[in-house]
Structures are given as C-alpha cells and as structure tokens.
C-alpha cells in the first residue's frame, strides 16, 4: 500500500539560535498526522540544552518528551546515516524545511557538499525539484551569507528568514514563534491556524 506523499515531510534542525522554531513546527506536523523525518545536528542538541534548558544526556528521552504524545509518525535519523530513505531521490515526500538553519549548513547546501544527511537530503530536494524551505537565523549577514541565500533561491529553495511580523499583535514569545512557524508551513503548503492572518 503506497503512502500519501503529501503527508510526508523532512525537518532539519541545526545549531542556529531558535531551536524552538524547529520543535514547534515538528509538533504541528505531527498533530496533523504527518509522517516526519527529523534530522538534528550536534549543535542543535547544544541549543536544546542552552535555550530550551533540556537535559540532553538521554536524547531518546528528549525526543519522547517533545513529540511522544502526538499522533503523527516520527522517524529520527542520525546525522551521518546516508542509508536513510530521505538520502535518495527515489524516496518521495512533499518537501523539507530546515528551521532554524545555521550559516554553515546554508553554505554546505549552496555548494552541494552533501557533507551529512541534512545537506544530502536538501540536495535531493533541489535536484528533484521538491519544496525546500530554509529558515536562516543569523544577524548581521555578510556577503557570503547573502550570496549563498541567493544561490539557493535561484535553485528553487524558499528563503524564509527568522523575522517575525507584528501586525498580528503578538503578546507572548509563543505568538512570535507561532507566526514564523506558520509562515514556514505556508511555504510548505500545510494548512494551520497558528496566527491570525491579515484581514481576518
């Protein structure tokens, strides 16, 4: 029995500040019963420890605490597992989002390095002309950062900087997180009610 391709997504979380963006987006996909392939870099685990104040000694326990009670299907992959299904273009999915995306990962993707599973899967999205949403989180940006974003945009990726809007009158940090996650989901074509849209 074939899977519904439109309900399969890959999420990458890197060591850029803002790990909660990736957590919230993954949670929302799972709530909507998506099959999610999750790849975290080593630096992402450090961010989980520093920003989310999580004890990352037992990583499987952390994954269960963050996502275990949600109805979707979660598959976590080692950063260097090139045998993972998402490393191949023959494995079909609706798209991929890297949220937040560090400048190191951005550079690897822009130059086709495929130095780890995250970069390889992004390379697959580009070559197969599938949705790839990149949420860079860095400030300020120098020329190489900007050139890499432009290069990826020209190859078909959506560059969605971690810049929350304020027209929805956010009252909490959660409101700001939900806005950005909602914009990323919009770019992936995923319905949601994470923020009030302009004119609603």
From Swiss-Prot:
Residues in the signal sequence: none
Pfam families reported in the protein's UniProt record: Flavoprotein
**Keyword match Transferase:** yes
Q: What is its EC number?
A: 2.5.1.129
Tell me the name of the encoding gene: ubiX
Annotated dimethylallyl phosphate binding lies at 167, 183
Its function, per the record, reads:
Flavin prenyltransferase that catalyzes the synthesis of the prenylated FMN cofactor (prenyl-FMN) for 4-hydroxy-3-polyprenylbenzoic acid decarboxylase UbiD. The prenyltransferase is metal-independent and links a dimethylallyl moiety from dimethylallyl monophosphate (DMAP) to the flavin N5 and C6 atoms of FMN.
Q: Per the similarity annotation, which family is this?
A: Belongs to the UbiX/PAD1 family.
Q: Which GO terms describe its molecular function?
A: carboxy-lyase activity; flavin prenyltransferase activity
Q: Which reaction does it catalyse?
A: dimethylallyl phosphate + FMNH2 = prenylated FMNH2 + phosphate
Q: Which residues form a coiled coil?
A: none
Q: Which NCBIfam families match?
A: PRK06029.1, ubiX_pad
Name of the protein described by the UniProt record: Flavin prenyltransferase UbiX
Identify the Gene3D superfamilies for this entry.
Flavin prenyltransferase-like
TM segment ranges: none
- Positions binding FMN in this chain are 15-17, 41, 102-105, 137
């Amino acid at each position: 029995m074939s899977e519904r391709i439109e309900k399969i997504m890959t999420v990458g979380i890197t060591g850029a500040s803002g790990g909660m963006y990736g957590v919230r987006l993954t949670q929302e996909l799972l709530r909507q019963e998506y099959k999610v392939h999750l790849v975290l870099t080593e630096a992402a685990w450090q961010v989980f420890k520093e920003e989310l104040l999580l004890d990352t000694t037992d990583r499987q326990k952390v994954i269960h605490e963050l996502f275990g009670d949600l109805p979707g299907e979660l598959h976590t992959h080692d950063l260097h597992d090139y045998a993972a299904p998402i490393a191949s273009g023959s494995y079909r999915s609706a798209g991929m989002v890297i949220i937040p995306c560090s400048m190191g990962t951005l550079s690897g993707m822009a130059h086709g390095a495929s130095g780890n599973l995250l970069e390889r899967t992004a390379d697959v999205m580009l070559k197969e002309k599938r949705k790839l949403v990149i949420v860079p989180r860095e400030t300020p940006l120098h020329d190489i950062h900007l050139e890499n974003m432009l290069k990826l945009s020209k190859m078909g990726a959506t560059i969605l900087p971690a810049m929350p809007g304020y027209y929805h009158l956010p009252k909490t940090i959660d409101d700001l997180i939900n806005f950005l996650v909602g914009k990323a989901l919009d770019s992936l074509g995923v319905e949601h009610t994470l923020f009030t849209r302009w004119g609603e």
